[in-house]
Amino acid sequence: MARQFSLENTRNIGIMAHIDAGKTTTTERILFYTGRVHKIGEVHEGAATMDWMEQEQERGITITSAATTAQWKGHRINIIDTPGHVDFTVEVERSLRVLDGAVAVLDAQSGVEPQTETVWRQATTYGVPRIVFVNKMDKIGADFLYSVKTLHERLQANAHPVQLPIGAEDQFTGIIDLVEMCAYHYHDELGKNIERIEIPEDYRDMAEEYRGKLIEAVAELDEELMMKYLEGEEITKEELKAAIRKATVSVQFFPVFCGSAFKNKGVQLMLDGVVDYLPSPVDIPAIKGTVPDTEEETVREARDDAPFAALAFKIMTDPYVGKLTFFRVYSGTLNSGSYVLNSTKRKRERIGRILQMHANHREEIAQVYAGDIAAAVGLKDTTTGDTLCDDKDPVILESMQFPEPVIQIAIEPKSKADQDKMSTALQKLQEEDPTFRAWTDQETGQTIIAGMGELHLDIIVDRMRREFKVEANVGAPQVAYRETFRKSAQVEGKFVRQSGGRGQYGHVWIEFSPNEEGKGFEFENAIVGGVVPREYIPAIQAGLEDAMQNGVLAGYPVVDIKAKLFDGSYHDVDSSEMAFKIAASMALKNAAAKCDPVLLEPIMKVEVIVPEEYLGDIMGDITSRRGRVEGMEARGNAQVVRAMVPLSEMFGYATSLRSNTQGRGTFTMVFDHYEEVPKSIAEEIIKKNKGE
């Protein structure tokens, strides 16, 4: 099957926004107008095409970025719907990595919201060109020019309207096109009957003023246009379009559109904007990569006759076909049934079938070309961020960086049958989501799962129940405490049992002392003259190590201590390895009274980014959580606060930060070191653990 759409006529775009700005509805309308969906699905009915996981329909939020293909005016548009909730930034990061352009959807009443700031920053990091769609113009309080102002003030974005709305709220009846200098009037509910009209008289002056501002803004980035503008020559609409496209593709300018996806207004014109102003795979710089063995840098041009190279950006488990690997082809072509090299893992993979996804129905295709986004069936070893390429011409494309998980909970299956299903489920979910981890805690034998936030883990547990039919009980978020000694002391451990027959006898004197942080446990044998025979020494060390797993204060592992065995005694008949092992563990228990044991807790390095006006509240909040502020700096129009805070005080912080900053703050945290728990708090933990 030959290529249907040329590379120049292909657009790979993402739709990004704050939660609830109307992103999924906008995507729905795009699919409706491009003829992919015959009945429009509403999110509040729980039936939107893109939100195809059951949970998304219930919660009305988009969790996984479904990729879908649509056609508009002779162009193929591949759309990736991205989630707007802060716990799912990993999904946004990975979709931005493989896109060529994006549509940022704003709510006309709120303008730029916090998650818009986060996603916008991510898009800037990856150099993704954007157009802006100010949605919900029919909503009470909708204000187009205010929304444009927030783009300047909160994002410092060089954004200018290429359209103006006619009316707002329930009076929103049409749109003025500032490039073509005409207007569009809507007559019916579905917004299919659009009438192109002259700009209404009462809007004429405003349209002239904003067209002037648009030309001025674009001319600053285009010398030829600047000369014409300064000499007062007429600038044609073709020249203006070409200049806007050039400035948008080079990420120096962001055209702003308006409409109401829910009321079916403005979506087709915004689609024209995608075709007119967002880049095709040919317009963006060729992707960089390295040659596996020589580490030389190389590039892959977006051409069908170049060697094949693609990036796997998402793994999904599909109930019918099993594991789906979504990938973006950067160069070359790929046929189903062929073999490729996974250069990241150095393994050959067979491409079973290639599917083009449309939200949740799929079409099988024989071949994909440079610039396409598709899903492959049959890949065994490929995970998110891996490169797939021609094994005769290997390359590793730069992968994606994912943050470490910050919150963990214990989870246990409700029955034996759930146990086996649970380990399969956890393995599959980890393949899909690089920010989710699962492991078994050696000390308690519990299964621990960790992720990016409480909502993230809620959804994981929910998916285990729905997709893998695993019923599990979930614990509260936990902190891994430790214990150590602060003083040195000589301690005796004696175990004697002699009541007829063979007895038990073990007797040791051990000097315990604190070790440096991070040095662990050191054991020294200083016995002279054989008062304790050599064959019992390993048993004494093993006895100490076993006893250290359950500490003397609250049962947490003891770390960073030294133990020096310097004296003891034995019995010819009754001594045994077991007796000395027990004597050693008794010595450790007796040390509790003399060695000043203390509790240690993990301290996290926290970075909070907040708008200036919330700085005071945030500093107060950190102090109330026993945090130490280590430094501050301004970044753009936000303040960055760096602090050390105990992990136990950070639970629920995301929620509290959201409410303290009206959702405009973000934070990251990583483990830094262990530190002594203050006495009053330690006493509470010890009481709780002893069940008092």
Swiss-Prot record:
Presence of the UniProt keyword Nucleus in the record: no
List, alphabetically, the GO terms of the cellular component aspect.
cytoplasm
Task: Give disulfide pairs as residue numbers.
Answer: none
Where does this protein reside within or beyond the cell?
A: Cytoplasm
Which CDD domains does the UniProt record give?
EF-G (cd01886), EFG_III (cd16262), EFG_mtEFG1_IV (cd01434), EFG_mtEFG_C (cd03713), EFG_mtEFG_II (cd04088)
Which SUPFAM superfamilies would you find in this protein's record? Answer: EF-G C-terminal domain-like, P-loop containing nucleoside triphosphate hydrolases, Ribosomal protein S5 domain 2-like, Translation proteins
The UniProt entry, under SMART domains, shows: EFG_C (SM00838), EFG_IV (SM00889)
| GO terms assigned for molecular function | GTP binding; GTPase activity; translation elongation factor activity
Q: Where does GTP bind?
A: 17-24, 81-85, 135-138
Which keywords does UniProt give here? Cytoplasm, Elongation factor, GTP-binding, Nucleotide-binding, Protein biosynthesis
Q: Which domain of life is it from?
A: Bacteria
Query: Which InterPro entries would you find in this protein's record?
Result: EFG_II, EFG_III, EFG_III/V, EFG_IV, EFG_V, EFG_V-like, EFTu-like_2, G_TR_CS
- Asked if GTP-binding is a keyword of the record, the answer is yes
Q: Name one GO biological process term.
A: ribosome disassembly
Domain tr-type G: residue ranges: 8-282
Task performed by this protein: Catalyzes the GTP-dependent ribosomal translocation step during translation elongation. During this step, the ribosome changes from the pre-translocational (PRE) to the post-translocational (POST) state as the newly formed A-site-bound peptidyl-tRNA and P-site-bound deacylated tRNA move to the P and E sites, respectively. Catalyzes the coordinated movement of the two tRNA molecules, the mRNA and conformational changes in the ribosome.
Concerning its family, UniProt says: Belongs to the TRAFAC class translation factor GTPase superfamily. Classic translation factor GTPase family. EF-G/EF-2 subfamily.
Q: State the name under which the record lists this protein.
A: Elongation factor G
Organism from which the protein derives: Anoxybacillus flavithermus (strain DSM 21510 / WK1)
Gene encoding this polypeptide? fusA
